[in-house]
Amino acid sequence: MGNLVAIVGRPNVGKSTLFNRLTKTRQAIVNDEAGTTRDRQYGKSEWLGREFSVVDTGGWVVNSDDIFEEEIRKQVLMAVDEADVILFVVDVTNGVTDLDMQVAAILRRAKSPVIMVANKTDNHELRYNAPEFYRLGLGDPYCISAISGSGTGDLMDLIVSKFKKESDEILDEDIPRFAVVGRPNAGKSSIVNAFIGEERNIVTEIAGTTRDSIYTRYNKFGFDFYLVDTAGIRKKNKVNEDLEYYSVVRSIRAIEGADVCILMVDATRGIESQDLNIFSLIQKNSKGLVVVVNKWDLVENKTDKVMKTFEEAIRSRFAPFVDFPIVFASALTKQRILKVLEEARKVYENRMIKIPTARLNEEMLPLIEAYPPPATKGKYIKIKYVTQLPNTQVPSFVFFANLPQYVKEPYRRFLENKMREKWDLSGTPINIYIRQK
């Protein structure tokens, strides 16, 4: 199960730069203007063999009397509840501010480890400013320069050392793990209740810490499966919380623990930006996907044409990955609820597919010979052999070629599309590798 690292602090202390450094991306916009990170940023990282998710809590709150304090207050409170490690970023060039003190007052009550990151120590002299931050009561300030990378390797060592040891609990690997995810009010709780009913038919429950995912094993409708949920759900009245950010953090937890994600879409609202954000999380984590268009009972004029138009719109927004099942359902009336579980089970089986090497070559090589990769720089590319890699999270295939460096992304997509035509790989991502023969 992955860990969650939250980056918190007042605006313009370098949170987005640190996020980019930890995730090795340029995903977060970096600007000197405070409040530049208007959207929530989340990414994946790995260090010393430990994978973890990173959330940059920068952002912007609309129609707030005090934009910065309101945003920081809500996101720090959520970080305190959700994160395994909290990075509190301060700016040594500005010293301790009132906002720093307000954030520190909250973090001193955190149950998770807090690392105070003294950023912008771009030269040795600036390190002499760091001791000022001891008065925040959060231990030693850890000096780094996010923009140059100085000190970030040691910071990563420290972050990983704070993670709890991985649970010794072992799940039955032959039983699929389903997570129901989606934006607020899409019907997640309703469909879970429809799945498991009032009796809940619990076989066994495996839980870790209060922030870990819970795997509850059910047997329902003839299916044996784990339903992935997260512990320690906070009551809505505990804080006037930012629901979008909170659901993203919660989705990270559920997605990481699942084999197949059941993404709930509200039929009365269609695809919105947060649906795309959660879909992106599913893709980043290489999980199986079933899209459920919930509240279908509320749609008027439910003709086949309307259903087809809705389906085409979903696939268009999720492109280029379009090979996944879509179920039009109603958690309230339990319409097609069994089909949701059936499709999730199929996607799980597709993720587990093992295709014999002889069959792969028998089906794919004639296609490749008929439609070879385009010649590059006058050189002809020949693919001689294909095999499936063992023990991978998703189906992964290696095509051996004489000039693998010249096989471009469009041809990889061609190979993937042809494989999806030949075998049922619906709902699961696949990996295509081109290697030297």
Curated annotation (Swiss-Prot):
GO biological process: ribosome biogenesis
Gene3D superfamilies: 3.30.300.20, P-loop containing nucleotide triphosphate hydrolases
Keyword Cell wall biogenesis/degradation: no
PANTHER family to which the protein is assigned, alphabetical: GTPASE DER (PTHR43834:SF6)
The family this protein is said to belong to: Belongs to the TRAFAC class TrmE-Era-EngA-EngB-Septin-like GTPase superfamily. EngA (Der) GTPase family.
Name assigned to this protein: GTPase Der
Domain KH-like intervals: 353-437
Keyword tags: GTP-binding, Nucleotide-binding, Repeat, Ribosome biogenesis
NCBIfam families: GTPase_EngA, small_GTP
Quaternary data: Associates with the 50S ribosomal subunit.
Job of this protein: GTPase that plays an essential role in the late steps of ribosome biogenesis.
Residue intervals of the EngA-type G domain: 3-167, 176-352
GO molecular function annotation: GTP binding; ribosome binding
SUPFAM superfamilies linked: P-loop containing nucleoside triphosphate hydrolases (SSF52540)
Pfam family, one: MMR_HSR1
Taxonomic source organism: Bacteroides fragilis (strain ATCC 25285 / DSM 2151 / CCUG 4856 / JCM 11019 / LMG 10263 / NCTC 9343 / Onslow / VPI 2553 / EN-2)
Positions with a binding annotation for GTP 2: 182-189, 229-233, 294-297
Positions annotated to bind GTP 1: 9-16, 56-60, 119-122
